[in-house]
């Protein structure tokens, strides 16, 4: 197996070039989580799973707060997140950031690269993250050959759009406490669907600054709202660990209805 160190101008990381002949059993399992996700979106056949596992890919690991994709870059690959958390964000000409989504293992956060030639957003790690880069043309070819896989990828894109619509509502119309509570509920629900643990207790990977940039608030306001949620008795916080003590009440505070997730991870 070939290992090289590659500097893309953003950071230096290990690039493992993988092909079918030298793929290990561990490498072959790289797509297990994303396959499980896609199976919830369409009734995949064994041939669909085999086609996904046969895709060429490169494994990369990046530290926190580093760009995987920069807005305007050529869109040649699709990123399958294996471990860790990343966010999508846009920035104004003056450098102000708006986080537009969070992503977790099993997600393909830049699936639009199947058809779009340029990235229209930034993709940045929140934690250390490991991901597989799949050439977009190879994934597009397999999707054209496997209708059920194409259906699953299309549904994933539609659910992504549904989540975007909910985020617009969250930032535009909910009060500060509801925004924070809603973000926590969504994160917990998506983690559970992704098989990452129960929704009632989790480690929150986002900083208060990142939460602020996702909810249109300041870090100070986020901190105050987290304290209020704890004072209300709906969450217990221990540094990064969050426990939702009353899920039904938390959902009422958040105005949270998981229907917009369409049972997606």
Question: Which residues fall in each region the model found?
Answer:
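Cyclic nucleotide-binding regulatory module and flanking cytosolic helices
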Residues: 5-64, 108-109, 114-115
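Cyclic nucleotide-binding regulatory domains
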Residues: 66-128
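Alpha-helix/helix-capping structural signal
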Residues: 83, 137-138, 209, 248
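Cyclic-nucleotide recognition modules
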Residues: 101-166
